[in-house]
């Protein structure tokens, strides 16, 4: 255990700032500290860890921070990690935030949002939101993930969507693999 005397509480505390050492750390932080790290950390791995840490926390404040990160972070992997953390909450507020996050520009981040929506089994509103993405998106990988998520929903209309997409041509048949 290390103790450092400081004049005030630090805004941000990081171990191994640029992730140079292979490690697993259990460092409990408050929602405010994680929000600050997710917003202001200059290290991608640090922002991803903050998104993952916020995924373990509940509450409106944590969900809002994750939605903001999905929509505005500089790197797609942080956006995708934030979407995954948002999907783990499985509340209607988180689902509605994920609906808004479908507008994210980067296809890999959008793919993470679509994958997070697949956590809402039996939700017809999610099916309605995923249906247009399964039919047509700028990215075949997003279409494939939409098909996977539609299958996870296990709703009566899911099979028809998957059957319609099964024979669609795509890069390396990724859409077919998603069905």
Model-derived regions, located:
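Alpha-solenoid helical repeat scaffolds
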Residues: 49, 65, 81, 97, ...
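Amphipathic alpha-helical scaffolding segments comprising HEAT/armadillo-like alpha-solenoid repeats
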Residues: 7, 26-38, 59-72, 91-103, ...
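Alpha-helix N-cap/helix-start positions at coil->helix boundaries
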Residues: 43-45, 60, 74-77, 92, ...
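Long alpha-helical HEAT/HEAT-like repeat alpha-solenoid scaffolds in very large eukaryotic proteins
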Residues: 137-148, 152-153, 176
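Non-catalytic accessory/interaction domains
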Residues: 1-81, 88, 110
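Short, intrinsically disordered, charge-balanced linker/junction segments flanking boundaries
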Residues: 70, 106, 167-179
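A generic tandem-repeat structural signature
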Residues: 99-100, 104-123, 141, 148
């Amino acid at each position: 255990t290390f103790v450092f005397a400081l004049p005030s509480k630090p805004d941000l505390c990081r171990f191994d700032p640029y992730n140079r050492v292979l490690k697993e750390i259990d460092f409990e932080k408050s929602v405010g500290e994680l929000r600050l790290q997710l917003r202001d950390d200059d290290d991608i791995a640090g922002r991803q860890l903050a998104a993952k840490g916020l995924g373990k926390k509940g509450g409106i404040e944590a969900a809002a921070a994750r939605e903001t990160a999905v929509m505005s972070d500089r790197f797609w992997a942080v956006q995708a990690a934030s979407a995954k953390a948002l999907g783990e909450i499985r509340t209607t507020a988180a689902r509605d935030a994920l609906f808004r996050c479908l507008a994210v520009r980067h296809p890999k981040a959008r793919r993470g949002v679509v994958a997070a929506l697949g956590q809402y089994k039996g939700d017809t509103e999610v099916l309605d939101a995923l249906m247009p993405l399964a039919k047509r998106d700028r990215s075949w990988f997003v279409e494939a993930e939409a098909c996977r998520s539609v299958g996870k929903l296990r709703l009566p209309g899911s099979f028809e969507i998957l059957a319609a997409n099964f024979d669609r041509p795509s890069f390396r048949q990724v859409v077919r693999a998603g069905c």
